């Protein structure tokens, strides 16, 4: 009898946990769909830029560089220049 009484007491907690888990999964799925939509939009913008004669690889590099801190970007450029000089590319 104690087992069935414990099961009855756990039901609201179990239902809450199931509902919470379902809500979390649904939020993740919704965000994944939004991420896919945004990714498609970004791809369309790059295609538009390419259609207008812009170099997509250069645009991607600029976008990546703009995300960096100015000091980090300067350090990366210095390292790149050092390597290029060592290889006789400058």
UniProtKB/Swiss-Prot annotation:
Xref: Pfam families: GapR_DNA-bd
Taxonomy, superkingdom: Bacteria
MF (Gene Ontology): DNA binding
Family recorded in the similarity comment: Belongs to the UPF0335 family.
Protein's name in the database: UPF0335 protein RPB_1426
Protein's organism: Rhodopseudomonas palustris (strain HaA2)
């Amino acid at each position: 009898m104690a087992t069935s009484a414990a099961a009855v007491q756990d039901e609201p907690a179990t239902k809450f946990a199931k509902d919470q888990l379902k809500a979390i999964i649904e939020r993740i799925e919704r965000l994944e769909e939004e991420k896919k939509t945004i990714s498609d939009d970004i791809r369309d913008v790059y295609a538009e830029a390419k259609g207008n004669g812009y170099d997509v690889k250069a645009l991607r590099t600029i976008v990546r560089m703009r995300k960096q801190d100015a000091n980090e970007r300067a350090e990366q450029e210095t390292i790149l220049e050092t390597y290029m000089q060592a290889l006789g590319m400058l």
